[in-house]
Amino acid sequence: MFSRDLTLARYDAELFAAMEQEAQRQEEHIELIASENYTSPAVMEAQGSVLTNKYAEGYPHKRYYGGCEYVDIVEQLAIDRAKQLFGADYANVQPHAGSQANAAVYLALLSAGDTILGMSLAHGGHLTHGASVSSSGKLYNAVQYGIDANGLIDYDEVERLAVEHKPKMIVAGFSAYSQVLDFARFRAIADKVGAYLFVDMAHVAGLVAAGVYPNPVPFADVVTTTTHKTLRGPRGGLILARANEEIEKKLNSAVFPSAQGGPLEHVIAAKAVCFKEALQPEFKTYQQQVLKNAQSMAQVFLDRGFDVVSGGTQNHLFLLSLIKQDITGKDADAALGRAFITVNKNSVPNDPRSPFVTSGLRIGTPAVTTRGFKEAECRELAGWICDILENMGDESVVDGVREKVKAICAKFPVYGN
């Protein structure tokens, strides 16, 4: 029998110490990685619940194990809330991650060797959209589209590639693109060549849920997302679709048993909490602020003479090109890290440097907005980043910014009492 008195701190002090150090880092550092956010205590409580003990292969009311009557309730809550949140007719909440959700979509609708048309990783796409190092680029014939000299998707070029290569699936989505996707145009192109339209909205799902970014569900055959990032839930995946019995059956079979075994019901419970939070009015206010904060930061960089890819942002992130300053993304990332500002180095269009070095930074505002930052704080923060980038090698500037970061983090804690 287990005793609830035997806490992790008592049982495994070494592990607990590392976790406490991470908690301290999150409180004392400013998080600007666009794909990161902070979950609520309720989300973490669900994910750390007794549901982790239960195997539940199959789907609600169609399980291969007994004793699933209560996890059926949990999973159905998550399904119903996801459908309500995004206006979908179908939702599969079982994918363990966004990449696995994407893999399931490919398994469901494609055969090995089929052609897919997706956004180039070098231009802001994602590994799973046909990059050569990903299974999506190895199992399928991946054709890539990119952005033009203005940093925008050239839809005429997308259409030309679609007509030329006749893809079975067109993938719309990104990991580093700061503008709004034209889902209606993607739909028209897909229809012209008889392709499925698959939208990966992992980065903007929270904005979509709040009505701050267009909803792809009415246009796409299938939509996937992660449940963290802007959605502010646990790490996991989600598949959505409009009513289509044939596609729904294929998607369910692709997730289980093709791609996964038993679902993680404790994570699904946390997803259900996240979806409930996203249905509240305050979530819309939060997402509106995420966008305002990103735009405020981007403008500071422009005013200070830095290059922002595509000239600004219409979502939660933007790419800062440091080619003109002859600063590598790797060095900028490290310098900011010493100032307790966490970003990620990122390739920029036509980057002359390798993906391990890069010439840019990707900056996002979901996490700082969760802390309570508004435009004033974000403008100040962007100014501190500029100070460091304009004085690379001057550790006194880094030291000064670090003290300012610690002070503002104390003023805006992630988890209050």
Swiss-Prot record:
* Main localisation: cytoplasm
Q: What does this protein do?
A: Catalyzes the reversible interconversion of serine and glycine with tetrahydrofolate (THF) serving as the one-carbon carrier. This reaction serves as the major source of one-carbon groups required for the biosynthesis of purines, thymidylate, methionine, and other important biomolecules. Also exhibits THF-independent aldolase activity toward beta-hydroxyamino acids, producing glycine and aldehydes, via a retro-aldol mechanism.
Q: Which UniProt keywords apply?
A: Amino-acid biosynthesis, Cytoplasm, One-carbon metabolism, Pyridoxal phosphate, Transferase
Where is (6S)-5,6,7,8-tetrahydrofolate bound in this sequence? 121, 125-127, 354-356
Q: What is its EC number?
A: 2.1.2.1
Name of the protein described by the UniProt record: Serine hydroxymethyltransferase 3
Cofactor(s) for this protein?
pyridoxal 5'-phosphate
Q: List the NCBIfam families.
A: PRK00011.1
Q: Where is this site: Plays an important role in substrate specificity?
A: 228
Which family is it part of? Answer: Belongs to the SHMT family.
Point out residues bearing the modification N6-(pyridoxal phosphate)lysine.
229
**Reaction catalysed?**
(6R)-5,10-methylene-5,6,7,8-tetrahydrofolate + glycine + H2O = (6S)-5,6,7,8-tetrahydrofolate + L-serine
Does the record's keyword annotation contain NAD? no
Natural source organism: Pseudomonas aeruginosa (strain ATCC 15692 / DSM 22644 / CIP 104116 / JCM 14847 / LMG 12228 / 1C / PRS 101 / PAO1)
Q: What Pfam families does UniProt report for this protein, alphabetically?
A: SHMT
Which PANTHER family has this protein been placed in?
A: SERINE HYDROXYMETHYLTRANSFERASE (PTHR11680:SF50)
User: What pathway is this protein a component of?
Assistant: One-carbon metabolism; tetrahydrofolate interconversion; Amino-acid biosynthesis; glycine biosynthesis; glycine from L-serine: step 1/1
Q: List the disulfide bonds.
A: none
Does the record bear Transferase in its keywords? yes
Q: How does it assemble?
A: Homodimer.
What subcellular compartments does it reside in? Cytoplasm
Q: What's its top-level EC category?
A: transferase
Its Gene Ontology cellular component terms are: cytoplasm; cytosol
